[in-house]
Amino acid sequence: MGISLPFFYSDNGVLNKAARIATGDIAGNCHPYKAGLLEEEEICLMAGLDYVTPWTRDTSINAMHAMCFFDSNIVRNSLISVCCSKDGKNIAGGDYWDSIIWAMGAWQYLSLNDDAEFRAFAYDVIKNTLAKFEAEELDSDGLFMGGAVYGDGIAAYPDKYAKTENHGTNIMNWPAANPDKRSKKGFGVPMKTLSTNCVYYAAYIIAGKLAEQLGEDSSEYIAKAQKTKDAVNKNFWNEKTGRYDYLFDDTERCDHSEALGLSFAMLFGIADDAKCESIIKNTYVTDHGIPCVWPSFSRYRIGNDYGRHSGAVWPHAEGFWAVANLRKGNIAGFEKELFSLAHKAVRDLQFAEIYHPVTGEVYGGLQEKAKEGFFLWKSCQKQSWSATAFWAMIIYGIAGIEITDTSIIIKPYLPISVNHAELKNLTVGDAQISIKIDRDSDAPKTIEIPKNLKGKQSYNLSV
């Protein structure tokens, strides 16, 4: 039941310390756990020091960020533990609106591991989960209703969505308190959000690829993916702001910037090159990283406070934004997130859940209850997806790793203040890969390696 850990070393002390802190936070959150469809107690990755469960979205995002390069068995265990059986069918568990993000974590695992048993399991879960929410939440415009990815708190949403049953803080309490405004089908939250619909697009693409691998017809999923992509571009793109809107329903639209949604649109290929350039140009980034939603909704702008899910800086979103910026050629945008997060981690000796957008301090943001009013929520300690987000910047940024359907491309990049970097013990299936990167050496600048390697493999590269 050991844990496999990668290592990072460079000639930049801040990055080195931050990487060690991130690795420590991740390792400390790996615990024996049994839930969902996991039949026996196994090591799984908890969401953070203050959490006792993996959570579906956290598990998938951790896998997408970096955890598959740490220990793929822990990823596999965690993914199975957040699934459940409903009406005799295996589906992804968790909050209903973004539970399909499970598909992306499963695909990341399968992209690095030839696991026939899990491939069949994943296809079954994804197929059933898509069918369930197509029946319940898919609207006539080709978009899925429900909250934003990870936006469980009402601080993520406009004033309309702040009135909830029993004055609860969760968006799932909204339909019961607003029977005249709830959607006629599904759970009842009528909004459509950018991030969630981007994830559905990705899930359709993944379902199509798994169908092909398993010898089934993929055409239905490919067609649905294209329809979802077209619907996102038609309904969310805003020429006036130069980026995608955050959300809309039948009565109002919110054109705030959503970090995860914009990042997903760029990373998943929903946005073309012109749109990506426009998004980067027209998205506000604070001195301490991209805020989850900006601007913060005005009801939370009390003194120096911001909303928990609107205005605050969440590192798991920073990770996606940083990688998207680098892949689209915005080096400055990548380095801002990389070094900002690294300095805060070294300062605090941990990767916290959330930070203040102006001061950079560990900060949980304002939430609200009608009877209690506004109150400051805790920023949880040693958050797994904050730590894996930093490692994502190392793996996909500095190492420049890109996973294709057939191979792994390594095209490194070094920040201007870094001339040497090493990554050791990255897990890729049955292999442990080490990468040494030097500026202006005679080594190749890009290599492509197969996925079916075994044992220890070392590569030298130059930038």
Label every PLM stretch briefly:
Residues 5-19, 66-79, 110-127, 141, ...:
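Structural helix-adjacent loops and short alpha-helical linkers that scaffold large soluble proteins
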Residues 5-53, 73-92, 139-191, 229-315, ...:
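Extended glycan-interaction surfaces of carbohydrate-active proteins
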Residues 10, 50, 113-117, 121, ...:
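A structural signal for alpha-helical segments
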Residues 53-59, 63-168, 172, 193-201, ...:
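Aromatic-rich carbohydrate-recognition surfaces in CAZymes
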Residues 194-236:
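Active-site neighborhood of glycoside hydrolase catalytic domains
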Residues 320, 324-463:
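Non-catalytic C-terminal accessory modules of carbohydrate-active enzymes
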